[in-house]
Amino acid sequence: MLSNFFSKNKLFKSKSSKGDAAISESSQASSISEPAINESHSETEGKKVIKRFLIAYRSVTFPLGFLCVTASCDIQISKKEYVISALLPFPCDGELHELEDKLTDLVHKKVSFSVEYQVVPVRQHRIKGIKNIIAVSSGKGGVGKSTTAVNLAYGLIAEGCNVGILDADIYGPSIPTLLGLKGEKPTSHDGKLMNPLESDGLSAMSIGFLVDDANATVWRGPMASRAFSQLLNETDWPELDYLIVDMPPGTGDIQLTLAQQVPVAGALVITTPQDIALVDAVKGISMFEQVQLPVLGIIENMSYHQCESCGHHSSLFGTGGGERVANTAKTPLLGQLPLDIRIREDADRGCSFITKGSAGELAHLYRKIARHVAAQLYYQLDMRSPTTAELIMPELKSSTANKSSAADLFSEAK
């Protein structure tokens, strides 16, 4: 039984995890009838209260309970605080920070979490250093996919894990601009692998780092697909819990290559509530289903505009579109993001409000969605697609017969 969980698990030595902001998500937790203990109560009684709270706790991130996903958990008492040590399979610093506040109020003594996140690969693959690859897609352009991908990556970092981003939009790369790395060039320590560039702890690679803005990338599908494959496989990625892949809009060669050649753990579909965007989002979901690539959920961007003066929400592109598509596709609606000028301004400047201090409302939204994505990936554990990468497109088979280096590939584009 869960009540015996603590007595059966030894303390796991772990690193401290500090949340940056209290996020309102865990208000969905089950209410606890246990009264707050008075200062006269013993520390042992306080420990019991914490145990009962954790046993009963439920939220969007922990629908089955906190202890159902905790590999190890222990409560230790010191003169100043209770320390809950735990081993968790996905990052959730923001929610743990709120739990610390709730438990501190409950027992009238400081409560803190000391956790280690042990993210494991959902699929086995041969790409060194990367545990899970998440594709961020959209059925059409102009829905804010790339901006969402970047802020989602920063949100995952803020929640406590190591993240990279790969720009798969060979024809219109935007990641260099969004990260403030425009004009930067990758280096190589061995002449074979490229070192990813870094922005505020986010490792990044894009064809935009290799091709000048003034030079159009005029490549046919097979060459673009090969370029993407080499960007992925010939980058010396650090140890990453998640690699976010910003895919080009639509359902073309790059999407098929990614789904069939690369061990993607799951895909996210970005849409707006507008009908014309929803139609294309449905097509994107259908494509992923046909190639047996699991869809983790839908993120609805530009859901509403909030008036800066009175706070009124205006639904400029309609309402409920993302939810309808999610219900039809039987996939979660992971979050709804506003149409906010601050998002656009930061994107143009090449910075993110999440890295500047995660206490704002927008940072809360992106971090909450990041938690939902990480949790959904863990709960889904979808193993339907092949566990090893395999080239299946005839053009790619012929083009890789005489394999060239990344440097050779991009010199061909000049």
Region spans (language model):
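C-terminal boundary of histidine-terminating zinc-finger modules
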Residues: 349-360
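Walker A/P-loop phosphate-binding motif and the immediately C-terminal alpha-helix
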Residues: 133-168
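A short, charged, Gly/Pro-tolerant segment at domain boundaries
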Residues: 369-372, 382-413
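Extreme N-terminal, non-catalytic leader segments
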Residues: 68-135, 381
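Switch II (G3) loop of P-loop NTPases
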Residues: 209-220, 231-255
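Phosphate-binding loop that captures ATP/GTP phosphates
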Residues: 156-218, 225
